[in-house]
């Protein structure tokens, strides 16, 4: 929340009407960063992928190249096993939101948007983001045990929630996949939604 008194103290030398205008603008900006149950954390840009790579190699379970991965069963079935070589993928712009309370997928998507991405877009985003935090370092992805979630249209055409989170106990990135509405998400998880370059599929 905007601490109006602290801000007013800092701009006390300005005329009263100017102080009021500044506070109004700050409050409007803050309100625009939140929905009812989701807080906007910021935006990230994933560079275009121009070199073909094999996600089955760089995201294979186990430790390799200084990064360790663990795969959940649904992730293996719906994301990893059907994975194909990733070629050209356009620049992706995402906004990230943090859940403020326990929410189901339908509630989350009603607030942040219905956009979903395809697997090659997910692999490209993860290739950029996870390998900037290979040992759970600070960065765009949460590294405190909370999830980083994307809504992905899997190879079978079904939209599912796909997440990665840093498991500090085992020093590994845990990759998993869930059916929508399978359970609620606790507060403080991070959800990514894309811009108009991302495919839109009904909830």
Where are these predicted regions, by residue range?
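A binding-site-centric feature that preferentially detects glycan-recognition modules on secreted/surface proteins
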Residues: 1-115, 122-203
């Amino acid at each position: 929340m905007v601490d109006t008194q602290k801000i007013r103290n800092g701009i006390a030398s300005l005329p009263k009407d100017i102080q009021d205008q500044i506070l109004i603008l700050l409050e409007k900006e803050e309100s625009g960063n939140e929905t009812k149950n989701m807080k906007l954390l910021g935006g990230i840009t994933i560079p275009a992928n121009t070199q073909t790579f094999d996600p089955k190699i760089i995201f294979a379970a186990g430790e390799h190249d200084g990064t360790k991965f663990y795969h959940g069963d649904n992730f293996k079935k719906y994301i990893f096993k059907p994975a194909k070589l990733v070629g050209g993928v356009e620049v992706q712009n995402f906004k990230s939101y943090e859940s403020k309370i326990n929410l189901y997928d339908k509630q989350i998507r009603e607030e942040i948007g219905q956009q979903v991405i395809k697997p090659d877009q997910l692999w490209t985003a993860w290739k950029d983001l996870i390998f900037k935090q290979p040992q759970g370092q600070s960065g765009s992805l949460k590294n405190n045990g909370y999830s980083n979630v994307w809504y992905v249209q899997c190879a079978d055409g079904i939209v599912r929630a796909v997440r990665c989170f840093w498991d500090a106990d085992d020093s590994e990135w845990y990759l998993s996949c869930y059916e929508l509405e399978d359970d609620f998400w606790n507060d403080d998880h991070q959800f990514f939604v894309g811009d108009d370059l991302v495919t839109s599929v009904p909830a």
